[in-house]
């Protein structure tokens, strides 16, 4: 099974093994992923399944989205996401839950990291600060030189400087599923996953574990 699911980060807690070892885990709620569209190689050039989760008021759904959901006979969700398929078969209207995973399985979790706003180079790139004394004046946290002189006469692309930090797509690979609660549609994943509590995350079987 290579397909993933859309979940919601609930927060972190810990569970204990039979030996009394404490394992920090992130609780991910896997809301029912409703299949809204099935794409195949003949019509779309690739095989994939499109899903939606949650609910959205009719006043917040555009006419195009309303028609798309109505065609699939699926309640409007808060968005649509797509997962590539290999050998799986799904029908429009099917639901995908946490049952597709099992304890001990390795997964990749993708989410949007917490936004930190405008950050300096010390916080953003782990630069060291300059001297506190020895003639240094009002330059304790500045990065210093950002380039050369007339040659090349410009700042190279990719130069680490101050700027917006966080709020970007981040994937943490090969996290172990400690427990699967099929009744409450919960996944307990070992370690931390990107994003704030309540944010959407995408859980897929680990790429590095397929081989």
From Swiss-Prot:
Keywords: Methylation, Ribonucleoprotein, Ribosomal protein, RNA-binding, rRNA-binding. The modification N5-methylglutamine is found at residue 150. The lineage of its organism: Bacteria, Pseudomonadati, Pseudomonadota, Gammaproteobacteria, Pseudomonadales. The keyword Ribosomal protein applies. It comes from Stutzerimonas stutzeri (strain A1501). Part of the 50S ribosomal subunit. Forms a cluster with proteins L14 and L19. GO terms for molecular function: rRNA binding; structural constituent of ribosome. Coiled coil: none annotated. One of the primary rRNA binding proteins, it binds directly near the 3'-end of the 23S rRNA, where it nucleates assembly of the 50S subunit. Belongs to the universal ribosomal protein uL3 family. One of its GO terms (biological process) is translation. This is Large ribosomal subunit protein uL3. The gene is rplC.
């Amino acid at each position: 099974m290579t397909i993933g699911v859309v979940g919601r980060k609930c927060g972190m807690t810990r569970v204990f093994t039979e030996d009394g070892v404490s394992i920090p885990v992130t609780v991910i709620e896997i809301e029912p992923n409703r299949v809204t569209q099935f794409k195949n190689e003949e019509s779309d050039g690739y095989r994939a399944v499109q899903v939606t989760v949650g609910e959205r008021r009719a006043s917040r759904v555009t006419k195009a989205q309303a028609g798309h959901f109505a065609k699939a006979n699926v309640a409007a969700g808060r968005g649509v996401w797509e997962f590539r398929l290999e050998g799986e078969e799904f029908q429009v209207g099917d639901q995908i839950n946490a049952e597709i995973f099992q304890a001990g399985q390795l997964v990749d979790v993708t989410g949007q990291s917490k936004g930190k706003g405008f950050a300096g180079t010390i916080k953003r790139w782990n630069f060291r600060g300059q001297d506190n004394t020895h003639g240094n004046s009002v330059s304790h946290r500045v990065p210093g030189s950002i380039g050369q002189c007339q040659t090349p006469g410009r700042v190279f692309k990719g130069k680490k400087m101050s700027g917006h930090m966080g709020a970007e797509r981040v994937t943490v690979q090969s996290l172990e599923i400690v427990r699967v609660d099929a009744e409450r549609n919960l996944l307990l994943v070992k370690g931390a996953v990107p994003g704030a509590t309540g944010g959407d995350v995408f859980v897929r079987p680990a790429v590095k574990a397929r081989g």
